[in-house]
From Swiss-Prot:
The gene is nagB. It holds the Pfam family Glucosamine_iso. It comes from Latilactobacillus sakei subsp. sakei (strain 23K) (Lactobacillus sakei subsp. sakei). Belongs to the glucosamine/galactosamine-6-phosphate isomerase family. NagB subfamily. It is an enzyme of class 3 (hydrolase). The active site is at residues 62, 128, 130, 135. GO terms for biological process: carbohydrate metabolic process; glucosamine catabolic process; N-acetylglucosamine catabolic process; N-acetylneuraminate catabolic process. The lineage of its organism: Bacteria, Bacillati, Bacillota, Bacilli, Lactobacillales. This is Glucosamine-6-phosphate deaminase.
Length: 235
């Protein structure tokens, strides 16, 4: 793993952008995208640039079950607001949170991933070490799955909703096994609340108790952290 320490999210976003730009110059065509607060400055930097994704494909990590694409808290909406409206891709894939047949939707999304191997995957990380919505206990070889969100994840995401009761309790998420198939992975983490998860990811044992520790199995991972998120690392 390569650890890049930055002073703030703006610098972190710039570092991530440089990796994206280099990938695009080297014919990367499929970009795995994440939502949440950690990649926002990265997306702002991409939007302000002259990068062109009109010949590229995006594949998102996850979506809440029960939210329509036009719901302001859905990840479809997040991606349109933060990236797609300004930087369109030829094709953009996200799980369908309103799918009437969830098992069929999981199979469909696994096929999307198989048909569009990811060149560069963007990740954030939860306080409990989750990547995507792969909560502690998720198998390292898992494919796309419906996930029951943990209490800590629901509480962490409540800030985006009017009431905690409005936070969906389930999501469809690309599995850890699917994430590990990406050629290159870039993870953003900021703030003291992520320090424990980052220590477990980088220096802890490979354990399903810390889903992101699975990244130790991958040979091209860059972790972009501020000093607070890196504060528990031994070096």
């Amino acid at each position: 793993m390569k650890i890049i320490k930055v002073k703030d999210q703006v610098e972190g976003g710039q570092k991530g952008f440089e990796i994206f730009k280099e990938g695009l110059a080297n014919d990367a065509k499929v970009f795995g995208l994440a939502t949440g607060s950690s990649p926002i400055k990265f997306y702002e930097t991409v939007v302000a640039s002259d990068l062109d994704f009109t010949n590229c494909t995006s594949v998102n990590l996850d979506e809440y079950v029960g939210l329509s694409a036009d719901n302001s808290q859905s990840y479809h909406y997040f991606m349109k607001e933060n990236l797609f409206n300004k930087k369109p891709f030829a094709k953009s894939y996200l799980p369908n949170g309103l799918a009437s047949d969830i098992p069929a939707e999981l199979k469909r999304y696994d096929q999307v991933i198989a048909d569009n191997p990811v060149d560069i995957q963007i990740l954030g990380i939860g306080q409990n070490g989750h990547i995507g919505f792969n909560e502690p206990g998720a198998a390292f070889d898992s494919n796309t799955q419906e996930v029951q969100l943990t209490e800590s994840t629901i509480k962490a995401n409540a800030r985006f909703f009017e009431n905690e009761a409005d936070v969906p309790t389930k999501a469809i998420s690309m599995g850890i096994g699917s994430i590990l198939k990406a050629k290159k992975i870039v993870l953003f983490a900021y703030g003291e609340s992520k320090a424990e998860a980052i220590k477990g990811t980088v220096e802890g044992p490979q354990t399903t108790d810390v889903p992101a520790s699975a990244l130790q199995l991958h040979d091209d991972v860059t972790i972009i952290v501020d000093e607070a998120a890196a504060s528990l690392l031994s070096k």
